[in-house]
């Protein structure tokens, strides 16, 4: 089971925000929700990457919880 919180970082300015995470598929993808906007994050082999409104975001994904 995974936490419902993740940290997204904007690659242009390195600003990080806490977002709601859902539909986690380890090593594949998860959905990040920020200000009611959904950003689909895809695994690139190192981090999850997603694009919205002309900006790129990265994340290590939500934490695994027991």
What are these regions (language model features)?
Residues 1-66:
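Cysteine-centric segments in proteins
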């Amino acid at each position: 089971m995974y936490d419902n919180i993740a940290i997204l970082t904007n690659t242009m300015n390195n600003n990080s925000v806490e977002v709601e995470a859902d539909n986690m598929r380890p090593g594949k993808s998860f959905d990040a929700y920020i200000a009611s906007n959904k950003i689909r994050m895809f695994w690139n082999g190192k981090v999850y990457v997603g694009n919205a409104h002309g900006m790129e975001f990265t994340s290590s994904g939500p934490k695994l919880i027991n």
